[in-house]
């Protein structure tokens, strides 16, 4: 005659009644039907309070000597399965914990001066439950500083708010994580893309409809006045990143998609690369004001590589043609340019005196340094540029600056 025995996964859980066979045994398959992965049963001895195992023979569980009774039997699992279950539970707990940690204060930038904390709370309450709002004010005047903070209860609400722009009291505002909350090692991947080469007949609705084929579009923004580009924000950052670098056809026009990098990231890159060009040292190619051998002071006049007689000011290249154009412009403004240019008989040679730049100079003595040459006198000074490797190129040039101490006049001569 069959009977029901009480089986549970843990002693603290509510047991389940499982039927036995007519001979009083219980099939292991009956147990695994309710507890997948089970491999046996155990119970606590009422006398010794120790756990005892139930005898298992060829998939059949045999009752203890005193019968099944009213005892509660606990399911046994293989150690590997139990370890996997524990790891799964721990992983789930960590995921839940991380999700809770991600919910944090959001900074709201670009607030109108008239916006109050109550206005801010009423606006963001349309997205979800708001835990806190704050408008930062000046301690002395009590006026708004133009930004504030907001915190939501649900992380999903936070993501939704961050993925779009907000019109608050007639002004567009941005809502994002403060810089201090963002990990420098794992920066947040942007969900916003830059759409270049747009035309004026493209509307926000048309762009939204086009990009919706790739994923959920949270926001479309076309700057006013029109500047031939737009921004599209997706709900999924992976979709946004997958489109970066692509050329797409919208209304018969090819548009280019790239990452919408924040302004502060671009500024940091400029700071890392230096102010004038990619090399440290301001003007020039190797620090200081130039790198001419022999103690010269040319502004980035790279010796040995200036085959065409041009000059390189860091990231700016100036060739003889440009210098000639500058000369023409100066001559139209300075009446004495022609006179000073004709008096350049004391200009130093534009030659190969690479070792004379460090020599002791007497008044009226000309000297040269690599691609640079100089001459000095009691009444004036001239600076000339030339190229030691200009032979046959016809692209060398000389320039000088003359200064008359007597007439108190100055000018450029080329």
Curated annotation (Swiss-Prot):
Record bears the keyword Repeat: yes
Biased composition of type Gly residues is found at: 275-303
Where in or outside the cell?
Nucleus; Nucleus, Nucleolus; Nucleus speckle; Chromosome
Per the record, the covalent cross-link Glycyl lysine isopeptide (Lys-Gly) (interchain with G-Cter in SUMO2) lies at 79, 84, 95, 102, 181, 263
- The domain of life is Eukaryota
Q: How does it assemble?
A: Monomer and component of the SFPQ-NONO complex, which is probably a heterotetramer of two 52 kDa (NONO) and two 100 kDa (SFPQ) subunits. NONO is a component of spliceosome and U5.4/6 snRNP complexes. Interacts with CPNE4 (via VWFA domain). Forms heterodimers with PSPC1; this involves formation of a coiled coil domain by helices from both proteins. Part of complex consisting of SFPQ, NONO and MATR3. Part of a complex consisting of SFPQ, NONO and NR5A1. Part of a complex consisting of SFPQ, NONO and TOP1. Interacts with SPI1. Interacts with RNF43. Interacts with PER1 and PER2.
- Protein name (Swiss-Prot/TrEMBL): TAR DNA-binding protein 43
Source organism (scientific name) = Pongo abelii (Sumatran orangutan)
